[in-house]
């Protein structure tokens, strides 16, 4: 089992609705919507798994990439004292709940994917690293949410970031 599995289990215990929303988003990303009017997370570039979207949620919320650290954080561990607290766990889940709509927002998701398509990535076979896509999405959301970066500037920056992280394997 991976750290993401443990975190998803914690979500099932303390926030089942959040886990279900993440799973539904991932299911929808794999199938073409039945009606043209339905806005969907479907795309040809990446088919995210729940642990992938969890990584995005954690990256946006806690600005951390190591799932091991996140597991401790959402269990309610105070990183300074090492003590576990029910109150702290509740606060951490509240932070996750606040950011989940942002990462699952289809406008954000499709706008980000347009950045990759604009860079010449037309289908999944051209993507060499799923993690590069995920971390680029985290940076896209941080730029949009935390720094209020103009959309055209954000698209340019994230497009360059994705190409360089794909070429170098560093993100």
For the regions a protein language model found, what residue spans apply to each?
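Flexible coil/loop and intrinsically disordered segments
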Residues: 1-171
């Amino acid at each position: 089992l991976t750290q993401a599995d443990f975190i998803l289990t914690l979500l099932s215990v303390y926030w089942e609705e959040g886990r279900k929303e993440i799973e539904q988003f991932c299911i929808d990303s794999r199938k073409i919507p039945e009606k043209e009017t339905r806005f969907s997370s479907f795309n040809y570039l990446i088919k995210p798994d729940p642990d992938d979207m969890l990584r995005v949620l954690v990256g946006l919320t806690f600005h951390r990439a190591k799932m091991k650290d996140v597991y401790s954080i959402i269990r309610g561990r105070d990183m300074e004292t090492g003590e576990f607290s029910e109150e702290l766990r509740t606060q951490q889940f509240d932070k996750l709940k606040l950011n989940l709509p942002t990462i699952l927002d289809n406008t954000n998701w499709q706008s980000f994917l347009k950045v990759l398509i604009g860079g010449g990535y037309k289908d999944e076979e051209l993507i060499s690293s799923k993690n590069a896509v995920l971390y680029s999405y985290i940076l896209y959301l941080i730029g949009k949410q935390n720094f209020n970066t103009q959309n055209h500037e954000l698209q340019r920056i994230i497009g360059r970031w994705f190409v360089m992280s794909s070429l170098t394997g560093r993100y």
